[in-house]
Every structure is written in C-alpha cells, then in structure tokens.
UniProtKB/Swiss-Prot annotation:
Example GO BP: sodium ion import across plasma membrane
Segments of skewed composition (Basic and acidic residues): 36-51
Function summary: Plasma membrane Na(+)/H(+) antiporter. Exchanges intracellular H(+) ions for extracellular Na(+) in 1:1 stoichiometry, playing a key role in salt and fluid absorption and pH homeostasis. Major apical Na(+)/H(+) exchanger in kidney and intestine playing an important role in renal and intestine Na(+) absorption and blood pressure regulation.
Name of protein: Sodium/hydrogen exchanger 3
Gene expressing this chain: slc9a3
Keywords of this entry: Antiport, Cell membrane, Endosome, Ion transport, Membrane, Phosphoprotein, Signal, Sodium, Sodium transport, Transmembrane, Transmembrane helix, Transport
Induction: High salinity induces expression of isoform 2 in the kidney; conversely, low salinity induces expression in the intestine.
GO cellular component terms given for this protein: apical plasma membrane; brush border membrane; early endosome membrane; plasma membrane; recycling endosome membrane
Residue span of region Disordered: 31-51, 740-760
Length: 832
C-alpha cells in the first residue's frame, strides 16, 4: 500500500513539473506580446524566412499563443485537483492538517518553482478574478444549503457579532496601531490616522471562505457553526462600507473631510446592507417564478439557478451594494421553492454542480494565496507592525466576543457557554477577502501599501495555518458539543413541530412577540400567498405535511416488508390491481385465493421473477415439465436481436427501468391504500349503505340454496382469471406480470406472502364459526335488526372495534362493516 501511494505521489510530482515547464513559456510569450518592437522584429524575421523558404501548406503547426490562456487555466485547475487527491490519500495527514493549509503550502512550493524558473511572478490572485469568478460560487453554495431554521433563529445574535463586532475590531485595531506609531515603536512610516483605520477595516472582518474551510472539518454543533459562519457572511456590508468610506477619505485627504461625510458613511451602511438584501430577495422571487414554468424544459432548468443567482451578485455590485449579501439571500430565499419546482434529476444536478464549483473555487483560492506570496516586490518587513497587528486582532476579538455574549445571554433562551465563546474567539479567521481588498489599494494615496500587503499575508497564513491546525485539538480538549449528521426520526419531527405550536401559542397568549410567534405567522403567510404564487400546484400538493408523513411511513412499511420477504426467501413481491396474498408466518388455508400463479407462490432461495430461477422441488409433473421446457427453449432457441427504443431527446432525460418500476409499485400501492380511504374521504352515508345492503341480501336469499334447517349453504369463494389475461400496462410504460389461473382448491397450502398493507387482517374463519351460545338443538331466529348487528361475544368482539387496515400503517380507523362477499353462515334464516 505504501509503495502504491509513493508511486502515485511521484507521478503527481512529475506531472506538476511538466505543467510548470509548459507554463514557463507563458511569461515569455506575454512579454513578447507586450513589447511591440520585439514583436515586429520577430514578425519581420519570420516573414523573411517564409519568403526565403516557402514550403507551401503545413499540415500540422504549433500555435501555443492561440490556446495559451484557456490551456494554462485548465492546467492550474488540474494541478489543484490533483493536489487535493494526493492530500486525501493519507487520512492521517488530513485529520491533523486542514486542507486549506495544505493548499497554501502547495501554492508556496509551486510559486517558488515558477519564480526559480522565470524570476517573475506571472501568476497571482487578482481582485477581479477573485471577486467576479471565485467568490460567488462559494457564497451561493453557502446560502443555498443554509439551514434556515438555525440561521433565522439566531439572526439577532449573528447581526450583533457581524455589525457591532466588526466595527469594534476595525476601530480598536486601527486606533491601537496608530497609538503605538505615535509612541515611535514602529519607526518612520508614511501613514496617518485614516491609513491605519483603513487597514483596520480590511483586516478586521472574518472571512467566510476560511471559516467554511476550517469549521466544516471540525464539525462543531449547529448553533456554534451558524453563528460564526453567519457572522462571516453578514459582516460583508460593514466591511464594504468601512473600506469605501476610509478609502475615499484617504483619497480626498484628511483636511478636506467634513462632518457631513461621516453622516453619509453611516447612511451608506444601511443602504448597502439593506439594498443588497433586497436585490437578493427580488432575484430569488424571479428565480422561483421561472422554475415554476420549466416543466417541459427539464434539461436546462438547473442553468437558471446559477445564471439568475450570479446576476443578483453582479447587479448588486453594479449598484455599489453588498454583492455577498445579495447572492446569499438569493440562495436562502429561493431554496424552498426551487427544490419544490425542480424534478429529482435537476435537484441532484444543482446540488453536485454547486458543490463542485464551490470546492474548486476554494481550492484555487488557497493555492493562489500561496503562489502570490512568492513575489519579492510586494514584501516590506516591519517586525513591530506585523507582530502588534497579530496581537491586537486576537485580543480585541476575545474582548468583543465576551462583552457581546454577556449582553446577548440576557435575551437568549439557549445560553452561549464559556467554551462556545472560546471557540468563537479562536475562530475569527482571515482569508482571501482581506488579501483582495489590500491589493486594491492605490500606492499613490497609501504610501505603506507594500507593508499592508505583507502584513495581510502574514495574518492570513497565521489564522489559516496555525489556528486551523490547533482548533481541532482545542475543540476536543474543551469537549465542545459536536454535530450529529443524522436524519431526525419521524417521532422527533412530530414532537418538534408540536413544541413549536405550543411555544407560539404561549407567546400569543402572553402577548409577547418572539421567534416562535414570528415563525408561525410567516409560515401561515407563506402557505396562503407565497407558495401559491411561486410553486406549481403539483408541488404544493406534494409538499403537504400530512402527505409527507404518510409517504415516510409508507417508505418504512416498504423497507420492512421487502427486508422481511428477502429473509423468508419469498418472491411474491408483485403489485397488481388484484388481491395479493402475503403471509410471512407460514402456510395457512386461505378462503380468498389470489391471482398469483402457483409457480410464483412457491418458496425459493432468492427473489426472482423468472421461471428458470425457481427450484424444481415439490411440484406437480406438469410444473416440472414446464420448467424443463422453459430451460430448453431458453438455451437452444435462436435469440433475436434486441430492439432498443430511441430515448434521446434534447429536452428530456429518459427514465431508467428501475425508476419506472419504482413508480409503478408506488402508484399501485397508493391505489390500494386510497381505496381504503373512500368511505371517510367521500363521506359515505351509512344509512343508505345499510339500506342497500338489505336490498342486496333480500335478492341473494331468493337465489340461494337453502337447507331444511333454515341455514344458508357455505360457499367456497375464489377468484378465477383466464389463462391469457394480463394486467394492463401502466401509462408510464412500467413492467407488467402475467397472471396464471388460480387454484380452485381452498385447502391448497401456498407459501406465498400475505401483504398486510393490501389484505384484510381479520380471520376469515370467523364467518364459518358457530357462536358458543347457540347449540345445534336450539336455533333462535333473529330479527331483521339483529341480522345487521352481530351479538357481542368473545368470538366476534373484535369485529365491533375499529379496524386498522395494517399493523404498520397510519390508515384511518374505519368501522368494520359486514362483508357482502362473505354471508354470515351462522345466522339462521327465518323459516316461512
């Protein structure tokens, strides 16, 4: 195993070296393109050689400049992906070192190789590439898969940390650095108060990319994760406003700043944050409406999710609003309606494509953070400034978290403990957002731009590598509650919903408007108005809570039914419109025979619906002859070529055979279950029903064979199906099964299975039993009313209780009616 891994690593290293060798001519070619004189000379010499040696048409030519840019991009993506594969070959490494730290180290190595080969930093992470192409997929993935309940339940806490906490960190860091500078401990720097505040505003914000990369591997509990991650998303508005305000003040000059400008900065915060949120909500509404009408173009509907979400990001950035808030709330607000409108294939496509884009963008970001650092022209070292920056951002982060948490705990139901505060303080990671903002600074106005860039790179490396390495041992040492990735049980869902209703009722009665009250009002508003506008009608029905619970119980029924049948070795898993005989307990006498063939009713060693898989044992000579004939024909006859139906379509994806069978089984199951709901669903009038029963029984008495003692003859009831009969093919092209004639012998002991979901659970022998209080000598002729109401006795008392159609079903309890197909033989008729 070790040799295989070492060989794989060696191959990856050799491939990386090959990529770098291919990338080296890129810089030279780019330099040649930027230098017009050299390009002209090269063209002249090439033209002269062409004139001197005209060889005519060339079959193959090497045109590197033609494919240079896309080729290099594809190679870098390939290198980053291969590096990710190599990291995960060893679980010991990835369990200790975060993937983001490994990618930064890989970027440093590759950047060093490129610098040694070409002596120029030809590959760097530019702000344009980061903000327009790499950041949107990551934020969209975070918003689309956001746990809305936890997010909105802790929204007040998240906004407190995001707004007040970010302003606190930016102001205290900038003022503290400026105070130390005035003391003369940093040397001679070309910076004033506004420059230090500008640096504090860009270094204070918690980075969402870094938080996602580290905290997803730690697996802390949901509340702690959503608070830290929500803060990193929502502090973008504060970061953008502070950065733009102080950057404009620096460009204008400290002497030209007026008091009105500070007021405009405060107003711009609300405009940027609320405007970005509004843009995201509007585009989420548009996306939900568009996906409502994509029923006939299923193939392209996943594209609308990405295109419209990306347009929300670009629109907010065009209007100088918070683009991160726009695409975040676009994903949060549209996820419910989009998932309801899209088909299952499109939902899976969106899920995997979004995860792939986010993971790829995150990989490229951290790798290029390492590559960008290998550039001596951007480095300026100042030990005091760098070390004090690390100290101030860590100390003020702890102070801000402790003070804000102490205030918030007075209003929170679930308190944030000391352990949670330690993790929140330690989880203030900085990343590519700070690096991209500091690169955007203009060196003409900010004299210490190179020092700010160097310090930002050190801060990013320290928080991502050092804090990322130590946060997992810290969480284990503090015994922080971890998240449990499991689907909640149906019982937990029902109790949780009941508690929500109880809490909202308590808040309503007490007159207090809290989270539960607002959530209940929003749910009602969404159900009455929004869902009807942004969901198609079929999606509204399918998302009904009662039906969803019923579907889950049906799924559990089916799983237990199939698992029990496989354990018993039965093969009678046939869903048909006729009755199905399912009996896991063993052979018994059945009054009502099924329409399943005798061959299929035999027990076999595996579940198979083909005759040649049925074991040839305990069968009649005719059955054995049929099996032998089947084997002979299967093996020796000419097999014709299969004819495949053309399933290609530009607008639809053909469903597989398994999906068709699953759909057919579900439809037939629901058909049988819905038949049981007809009396209660359609509002059957039992008075009319009993009157019709009297008429039918009167007509039966005239045509029945009466015996001298006044009793009706007991008939053996069985269903007969013609030999050539078939179940109709379903509309969706599902499978069908041939039905062979049923046996007329009521004493036949079949080992098929009685499906409790389809067959009545009551004992059919009750119709043939004589009550113990009636002797053969004494026969009392009951009245007409007594004929409709059976006397209460231990034997038939269960007939008077509500009848549940399945011991694992949630079907409504129905009153047990007297079956018309089975006349009560123990009730004597009146003698004339």
């Amino acid at each position: 195993m070790g040799r295989n891994r070492s060989g794989c690593v060696a191959r990856c290293v050799s491939l990386t070296a090959l990529v770098l060798l291919l990338c080296c001519p890129v810089v030279r070619s780019s330099e040649a393109e930027t230098d017009p004189d050299s390009h002209t000379e090269h063209g002249d010499s090439h033209g002269g050689s062409r004139e001197g040696n005209d060889t005519g048409f060339q079959i193959v030519t090497f045109r590197w400049e033609h494919v240079q840019t896309p080729y290099v991009i594809a190679l870098w993506i390939l290198v980053a992906s291969l590096g990710k594969i190599v990291f995960h070959l060893s679980e010991k490494v990835t369990s200790v070192v975060p993937e983001s730290a490994l990618l930064i180290v890989l970027g440093l190595i590759l950047g060093g190789i490129v610098w040694a080969a070409d002596h120029s930093a030809s590959f760097t992470l530019t702000p344009t590439v980061f903000f327009f192409y790499l950041l949107p997929p990551i934020v969209l993935d975070a918003g689309y898969f956001m746990p809305n309940r936890h997010f909105f339940g802790n929204l007040g806490t998240i906004l407190t940390y995001a707004v007040i906490g970010t302003v606190w960190n930016a102001a205290t860091t900038g003022l503290s650095l400026y105070g130390v500078f005035l003391l003369g401990l940093m040397g001679d720097l070309k910076a004033g108060l506004l420059e230090f505040l500008l640096f504090g505003s860009l270094i204070a914000a918690v980075d969402p990319v870094a938080v996602l990369a580290v905290f997803e591997e730690v697996h802390v509990n949901e509340v702690l994760f959503i608070i830290v991650f929500g803060e990193s998303l929502l502090n973008d508005a504060v970061t953008v406003v502070l950065y733009n305000v102080f950057n404009s003040f620096v460009e204008v000059g400290a002497g030209n700043v007026q008091g009105l400008d500070y007021f405009k900065g405060i107003v711009s915060f609300f405009v940027v944050s609320l405007g970005g949120t509004a843009v995201g909500i509007i585009f989420a509404f548009i996306l939900s409406l568009v996906t409502r009408f994509t029923k006939h173009v299923r193939v392209i509907e996943p594209g609308f999710v990405f295109v419209i979400s990306y347009l929300s990001y670009l629109t907010a950035d065009m209007l100088s609003l918070s683009a991160i808030l726009a695409i975040t709330f676009c994903g949060i607000c549209c996820q419910k309606y989009v998932k309801a409108n899209l088909c299952e294939q499109s939902i899976t496509t969106v899920r995997y494509a979004m995860k792939m884009l986010a993971s790829g963008a995150e990989t490229i970001i951290f790798m290029f953070l390492g590559i960008s650092a290998v550039n001596p022209t951007i480095w300026t070292w100042n030990t005091a400034f760098i070390l004090l920056t690390l100290v101030f951002i860590s100390v003020y982060r702890v102070i801000g978290v402790v003070i804000q948490t102490w205030i918030l705990n007075h209003y929170r139901v679930v308190q944030l403990e000391i352990i949670d505060q330690v993790v929140m303080s330690y989880g203030g990671l900085r990343g590519a957002v700070a690096f991209a903002l500091v690169v955007l600074l203009d060196s003409n106005y900010v004299g210490e731009r190179r020092l700010f860039v160097s310090t930002t790179i050190i801060v990013v490396y320290f928080t991502v590598i050092f804090q990322g390495l130590t946060i997992k041992p810290l969480v284990k040492w503090l015994k922080v509650k971890r998240s449990q990735h499991k689907e909640p049980l149906l019982n937990e869902k029902l109790h949780g919903r009941a508690f929500d209703h109880i809490l909202s009722a308590i808040e309503d009665i007490s007159g207090q408007i809290g989270h539960n009250y607002l959530r209940d009002k929003w749910t009602n508003f969404d159900r009455k108005y929004l869902s009807k506008i942004m969901m198609r009608k079929s999606a509204q029905i399918s998302r009904d809570k009662i039906l969803s619970v019923f579907r889950e119980l049906n799924l559990k029924d089916a799983i237990s039914y199939v698992s029990e049948g496989e354990r018993k070795g039965s093969l009678a898993f046939i869903r048909s419109s006729s009755d199905v005989n399912v009996d896991f307990t063993g052979p018994r006498h059945s009054v009502v025979d099924s329409s399943v063939s005798a061959v299929l009713r035999e027990s076999t060693s595996e579940v198979c619906l083909d005759m040649h898989a049925v074991e040839n044992r305990a069968k009649s000579p005719k059955d054995r002859e049929e099996i032998v004939t089947h084997h002979m024909l299967q093996q020796h006859l000419y097999k014709p070529r299969k004819r495949y139906r053309l399933n290609y379509s530009r607008h639809k994806l053909a469903r597989s055979e398994g999906e068709k069978q699953d759909k057919e089984i579900f439809q037939r199951t629901m058909k049988k279950r819905l038949e049981n709901f007809k009396p209660t669903k359609l509002g059957t009038n039992y008075t009319t029903k009993f009157r019709n029963m009297k008429k039918e029984r009167a007509a039966k008495k005239k045509h029945s064979d009466a015996v001298p003692n006044g009793r009706l003859a007991t008939h053996s009831v069985s269903f007969h199906v013609n030999k050539d009969s078939e179940v109709e093919d379903p509309a969706d092209g599902g499978i069908s099964f041939l039905i062979t004639p049923a046996s007329n012998d009521a004493d036949e002991t079949g080992t098929g299975i009685d499906n409790p979901s389809f067959s009545n659970e009551e004992d059919q022998s009750i119709y043939q039993m004589i009550p113990p209080w009636i002797s053969n000598e004494e026969t009392v002729i009951p009245s007409q009313r007594a004929r409709l109401q059976i006397p209460r006795s231990p034997t038939n008392f269960r007939r008077l209780t509500p009848l549940q159609l399945s011991n694992r079903s949630i079907d409504a309890f129905l009153l047990a009616d007297i079956s018309d197909e089975h006349p009560l033989s123990f009730l004597p008729e009146s003698s004339m």
